């Protein structure tokens, strides 16, 4: 049985509240779960009351093979329970092809202007 440590939504409309639960991957998001190991109230301001986790039980379930979802792994990383590897995609932040062409043309024009200025200064 594959297990996940994930969020199960509770609360009312426009007032979300999430339970951090250990559940079978085949179970519905808000359906059957094995154990509640924490909670997250995104409505509260950023303080200690916003995320509550039972570190001992979470470590037990991780040792049993439960995989935390990305959002839960962020909480665990902040609490110092588990380490979330940083993702690195250096090409994602680069400008597109046309923007790179424009930058190259602008740089070339700037170099030509600097060369003309240096030539005029040497005369």
Swiss-Prot record:
Pfam family of the protein (one): Ribosomal_S16
Region described as Disordered: spans on this chain: 79-123
Xref: InterPro entries: Ribosomal_bS16, Ribosomal_bS16_dom_sf
This protein's UniProt keywords: Ribonucleoprotein, Ribosomal protein
Record flagged with keyword Ribosomal protein: yes
GO cellular component: cytoplasm; small ribosomal subunit
PANTHER family: 30S RIBOSOMAL PROTEIN S16, SMALL RIBOSOMAL SUBUNIT PROTEIN BS16M
Protein name per Swiss-Prot or TrEMBL: Small ribosomal subunit protein bS16
Species the sequence originates in: Brucella melitensis biotype 2 (strain ATCC 23457)
Gene for this chain: rpsP
């Amino acid at each position: 049985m594959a297990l996940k440590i994930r969020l199960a939504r509770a609360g009312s409309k426009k007032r979300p509240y999430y339970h951090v639960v250990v559940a079978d991957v085949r179970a519905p998001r808000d359906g059957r779960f094995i154990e509640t190991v924490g909670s997250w109230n995104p409505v509260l301001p950023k303080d200690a009351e916003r995320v509550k986790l039972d570190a001992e039980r979470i470590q037990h379930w991780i040792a049993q093979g439960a995989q935390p979802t990305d959002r839960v792994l962020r909480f665990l990383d902040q609490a110092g329970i588990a380490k979330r590897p940083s993702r690195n995609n250096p090409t994602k932040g680069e400008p597109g092809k046309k923007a790179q062409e424009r930058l190259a043309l602008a740089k070339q024009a700037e170099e030509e202007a600097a060369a003309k200025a240096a030539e005029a200064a040497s005369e």
